[in-house]
């Protein structure tokens, strides 16, 4: 027998269960992967390996980036001006410096991801606003509910494709030049 020493971690009480959480953004940073721009966003009370990685995504119709900009919009970060263009869809001008996200509150959706090493928590790429009223942008309980429901729907759609992007599915479909005409025998 021997006398041993062990260090007991105190834990920080962070909640890793699946579901919506209102968090405060600690910091954020832009980077690139395979020529694709993304932003990593970290949160107070969570370690450095628990972040949201959000890739730049452009709307095919309007040609406007929306995935990263929603993080600024929903947290009311860097908002410079909101212009009513008469269409019922205001135009928001914002400063996309990641430092503007620091200290801002936002709702994030945690989900569980299965790997060969086990299951771990991740943060979904689409946030939802918190209830707030400002001179630039305001969000009601109804707005928050709408954006949460929309993010959940998009998450479930992504999950049902087993994590594959629409573009990868389209690529596979377009590479099949001679699809079989007969029914599959089994």
Task: Mark where each language-model region is.
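Short beta-rich binding modules
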Residues: 1-186
């Amino acid at each position: 027998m021997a006398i041993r020493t062990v260090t007991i971690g105190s834990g920080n009480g962070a909640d890793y269960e699946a579901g919506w959480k209102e968090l405060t953004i600690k910091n954020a940073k832009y980077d690139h992967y395979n020529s694709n721009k993304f932003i990593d966003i970290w949160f107070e009370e969570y370690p450095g390996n628990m972040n949201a990685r959000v890739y730049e995504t452009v709307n095919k119709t309007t040609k406007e980036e929306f995935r990263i900009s929603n993080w600024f919009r929903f947290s009311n970060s860097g908002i410079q001006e909101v212009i009513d263009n008469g269409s019922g869809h205001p135009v928001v001008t914002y400063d996309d410096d990641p430092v503007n996200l620091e200290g801002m509150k936002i709702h994030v959706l945690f989900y569980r991801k299965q790997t060969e090493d086990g299951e771990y928590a991740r943060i979904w790429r689409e946030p939802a606003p918190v209830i707030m009223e400002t001179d630039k942008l305001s969000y009601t309980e109804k707005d928050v509910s709408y954006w949460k429901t929309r993010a959940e729907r998009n998450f479930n759609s992504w999950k049902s494709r087993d994590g594959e992007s629409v573009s990868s599915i389209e690529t596979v479909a377009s590479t099949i030049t001679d699809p079989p005409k007969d029914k599959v025998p089994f």
